[in-house]
Amino acid sequence: MHDVLIIGSGVIGMSIARHLSATHLDVAVIDRDVPGKHASYKAGGMLGAQNEFTEDSDLFQLAIESRAMFPQLSKSLLDETGIDIQFKNSGLIKIANEHDDISSIKRQYQFLNSQDRSVKQLSDDDLLQLTHGEVKPSYAAIHIPHDGQINAHHYTLALLESMKLRDIKRYASTEVTSIAVSYTHL
């Protein structure tokens, strides 16, 4: 019997299991097939904590807090597993490639800049300079300097290795089709 069962061994499930294992709970992860081979395996590695927000919310605040943890998480995983997730605080450029995207990106800029004054609108010259000429001018662009990226494949491998080192039980090739809830008193 386990204290906690986590369904899904993508990066979210493995991260939760890794964190909970430090509390001395008996944690196990169930996966329908091979761990880390779906969305986690295909991810590009962009953290994008601010990328989709146009207003303040609990989720926005959680995303910002999560992003702030990546430098230490990267070091912790490297120390524990020897796998470098290649965290880079490289910033993020968001571009409006179509005229219809201009109002959306400007609304997002207004919100993000109100939360972080380092978020800037980019002129065509700014965009060319920031990307060393690799990105052509667009309808509108913003720069989010405090965002970052990781190597998603290395992140998945590091979390998987961490689970092994922590003896977190994994049930692979096990599909959960329903959950039965029962209450017992200790």
Question: What residue ranges belong to the model's regions?
Answer:
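N-terminal Rossmann-like FAD-binding beta1-loop-alpha1 element of flavoenzymes
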Residues: 4-28
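Glycine-rich FAD pyrophosphate-binding loop
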Residues: 22-41
